[in-house]
Amino acid sequence: GLRYWKSQGSAALLGKVAAKVKTASTREIPYQKWIVRHLPSARELERQRREKFEFQPKISIVIPLYKTNEKYLRQLVDTIRNQTYPNWELCLSDGSGANSPIARILEALKASDERIKVVSHAEPLQISENTNAAIEIATGDYIAFADHDDELTPHALFECVKALNKNREIKVLYSDEDKMSMDGHKFFQPHFKPDYNP
């Protein structure tokens, strides 16, 4: 304060104040706290479920599978079923080959929801062939790509359709992505993508 100003002078005091202000303004909020603040509340998710868009495109979520861990597969499907936007179909291509370890679970998933489509292959497929096979069974207006160990936040498709309703000329949408702890309680390593700039 005053003692520092008397001993060091005005320029030194201003420099010290500026450094403190800069430090305070650039202090980062821990990401986990930030993401929790920005995820929609249960009330907001319910509001989204009731909202009826003028334009309601079907979104085909295509996923290539290869000997996928059953736990991750179920978690993925649960996050898709839990979407606040309901007009989707899930197109799964099992490229595991003969005696696929996930054949039974895929049949059960297909039987449980008419929006889930499955195609299986006798021979193992590379990821590009497997993805193309999933695209071939898609009937939606838009295609969304996901990996077999991904999860979607409940409002993911809602936000895409909201953007499409604001601008029907949109041909391609992309989103930010994040990593999540194995127990699903902690988010880390966000990848915030910039606005499209050709």
Predicted regions and their residues:
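Short, acidic, metal-binding catalytic loop of nucleotide-sugar glycosyltransferases
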Residues: 77-87, 166
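Short aromatic/hydrophobic "clamp" motif used to bind/position activated sugar donors
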Residues: 143
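N-proximal low-complexity "stem/linker" segments adjacent to membrane-targeting elements
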Residues: 14-81
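Glycine-rich, basic loop-to-helix element that forms the pyrophosphate-binding segment
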Residues: 121-138
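Short beta-strand segments
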Residues: 63, 91-94, 173-176
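Conserved donor NDP-sugar-binding/catalytic core segment of glycosyltransferases
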Residues: 151, 155-187
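Short, flexible, basic/aromatic active-site loop/helix in glycosyltransferases
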Residues: 183-198
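A conserved acidic beta->alpha catalytic loop
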Residues: 86, 94-105, 123-124, 147
